[in-house]
Amino acid sequence: MEKQIYSYDEAYEESLRYFQGDELAARVWVNKYAVKDSFGNIYEKSPEDMHWRIANEVARVESKYPNALTAKELYDLLDHFKYIVPQGSPMTGIGNDYQVASLSNCFVIGVDGAADSYGAIIKIDEEQVQLMKRRGGAVSYTHLTLPTI
């Protein structure tokens, strides 16, 4: 089944309706959170579509456990950001088949032991690059790095 592709203007207008005329919210949602493929094709027309994507994916995982919430129950919690407000990376990443995204926003990284060698510093840099390319933020725990005097 081929997914519907929306133009920027279609997604913006529908998001503007959803956000009751808030132009900034509508533009930010389309630019940052609407599902897009690597060619920039937009696959969600409004935050309602996003909430259904998130609800369906969480319900899929929840179904493996007792007392699971249905997709509709989860959608009702997400709708208009009333009870559950996912942060940026989860809003983009949950149920998104078009890109690899982190489901967490921020990570603390570091190495075991002293981090005062070139190798340890490069390892931390590599971890930061991998996290940032997946839209995660990184905090380096570098208190073990010795200053040069």
Predicted feature residues:
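A short, hydrophobic C-terminal helix/tail in secreted or cell-surface proteins
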Residues: 145-149
